[in-house]
């Protein structure tokens, strides 16, 4: 993977970088039609038109690619035919042609190449792109697209460059221990499936967007500080000039404490499966 740098021909180009897609992607053609569905823009609104997620809206129109997170096509080999861009995620995707004629998209893992064969099986070989139950994967292996519930589909480590490491297995064989990229160590049922390898496009976090307009293309709207708003818009607002917030601690637009408050529900059933909390940034 390579980062492409631009000359400072304009203010927006200064320090701007992009991913060199030509080094990885194999096609500029349209995606597989049978695996594409239309996607309507929600702009962070619910069915009543109220904002439920701030700073979203606009952006380029996209079509959704149906990704096989479940990898439930068992014991049937497939061949990677293309590596493609997906506007809905920061990872790339691969089109897999199975021997029975079916086609599916899976996440692109570091080291995948066109022509490679992949399979999801109980006793699949431990090589990049194959999917197997956690109980049959050796300790120390880097994984992605890990299930939290058997058969539900991968939920952990799906974004660009992410992976989890299998640290160990319980004596009774029911759970395995994983270390997440956040530093959290947790247990997962050994029957859950995971895919071998790290998600590709690992240099995505190094991209310098260069100008606000590129974020608008992605559907990200500006984030305005509360201290520059009016008092009817935010608890930090109001005052003459650059006034302090006038409170002991920063708060959200709805008056709740904003910093240092743990937001995870301690009564969650999965709380007992967390061996070590995630490390602070």
Swiss-Prot record:
<dbReference type="InterPro" id="IPR002171">
    <property type="entry name" value="Ribosomal_uL2"/>
</dbReference>
<dbReference type="Pfam" id="PF00181">
    <property type="entry name" value="Ribosomal_L2"/>
</dbReference>
<dbReference type="GO" id="GO:0003735">
    <property type="term" value="F:structural constituent of ribosome"/>
</dbReference>
<dbReference type="InterPro" id="IPR022671">
    <property type="entry name" value="Ribosomal_uL2_CS"/>
</dbReference>
<dbReference type="Pfam" id="PF03947">
    <property type="entry name" value="Ribosomal_L2_C"/>
</dbReference>
<comment type="similarity">
    <text>Belongs to the universal ribosomal protein uL2 family.</text>
</comment>
<comment type="function">
    <text>One of the primary rRNA binding proteins. Required for association of the 30S and 50S subunits to form the 70S ribosome, for tRNA binding and peptide bond formation. It has been suggested to have peptidyltransferase activity; this is somewhat controversial. Makes several contacts with the 16S rRNA in the 70S ribosome.</text>
</comment>
<dbReference type="InterPro" id="IPR014722">
    <property type="entry name" value="Rib_uL2_dom2"/>
</dbReference>
<keyword id="KW-0687">Ribonucleoprotein</keyword>
<dbReference type="GO" id="GO:0019843">
    <property type="term" value="F:rRNA binding"/>
</dbReference>
<dbReference type="InterPro" id="IPR022669">
    <property type="entry name" value="Ribosomal_uL2_C"/>
</dbReference>
<dbReference type="InterPro" id="IPR005880">
    <property type="entry name" value="Ribosomal_uL2_bac/org-type"/>
</dbReference>
<keyword id="KW-0699">rRNA-binding</keyword>
<dbReference type="InterPro" id="IPR012340">
    <property type="entry name" value="NA-bd_OB-fold"/>
</dbReference>
<comment type="subunit">
    <text>Part of the 50S ribosomal subunit. Forms a bridge to the 30S subunit in the 70S ribosome.</text>
</comment>
<dbReference type="GO" id="GO:0002181">
    <property type="term" value="P:cytoplasmic translation"/>
</dbReference>
<feature type="region of interest" description="Disordered">
    <location>
        <begin position="223"/>
        <end position="255"/>
    </location>
</feature>
<dbReference type="InterPro" id="IPR022666">
    <property type="entry name" value="Ribosomal_uL2_RNA-bd_dom"/>
</dbReference>
<dbReference type="InterPro" id="IPR008991">
    <property type="entry name" value="Translation_prot_SH3-like_sf"/>
</dbReference>
<keyword id="KW-0689">Ribosomal protein</keyword>
<dbReference type="InterPro" id="IPR014726">
    <property type="entry name" value="Ribosomal_uL2_dom3"/>
</dbReference>
<dbReference type="GO" id="GO:0016740">
    <property type="term" value="F:transferase activity"/>
</dbReference>
<keyword id="KW-0694">RNA-binding</keyword>
<dbReference type="GO" id="GO:0015934">
    <property type="term" value="C:large ribosomal subunit"/>
</dbReference>
<protein>
    <recommendedName>
        <fullName>Large ribosomal subunit protein uL2</fullName>
    </recommendedName>
</protein>
């Amino acid at each position: 993977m390579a980062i492409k740098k631009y000359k400072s021909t304009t203010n927006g180009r200064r320090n701007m970088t992009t991913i060199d897609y030509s080094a990885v992607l194999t096609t500029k053609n349209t995606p597989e039609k049978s695996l594409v569905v239309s996607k309507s823009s929600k702009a962070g609104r619910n069915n009543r038109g109220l904002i439920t997620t701030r700073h979203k809206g606009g952006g380029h129109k996209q079509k959704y690619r149906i990704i096989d997170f479940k990898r439930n096509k068992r014991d049937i080999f497939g061949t990677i035919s293309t590596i493609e861009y997906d506007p809905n995620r920061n990872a790339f995707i691969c089109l897999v042609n199975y021997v029975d004629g079916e086609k599916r998209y899976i996440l692109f893992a570091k080291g995948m190449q066109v022509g490679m064969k992949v399979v999801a099986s109980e006793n699949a070989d431990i090589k990049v792109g194959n999917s197997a139950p956690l109980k049959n994967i050796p300790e120390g292996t880097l994984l992605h697209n890990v299930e939290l519930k058997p058969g539900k589909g991968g939920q952990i480590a799906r974004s660009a460059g992410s992976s989890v490491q299998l640290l160990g297995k319980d004596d009774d064989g029911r759970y395995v221990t994983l270390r997440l990229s956040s530093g959290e160590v947790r247990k997962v049922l050994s029957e859950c499936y995971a895919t071998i390898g790290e998600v590709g496009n690992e240099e995505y976090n190094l991209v310098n967007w260069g100008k606000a307009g590129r974020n608008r293309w992605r559907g990200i709207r500006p984030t305005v500080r509360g201290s520059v708003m009016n008092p009817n818009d935010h608890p930090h607002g109001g005052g003459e000039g650059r006034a302090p917030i006038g409170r002991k601690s920063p708060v959200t637009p709805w008056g709740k404490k904003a910093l240092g408050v743990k937001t995870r529900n301690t009564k969650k059933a999965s709380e007992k499966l967390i061996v070590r909390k995630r490390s602070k940034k």
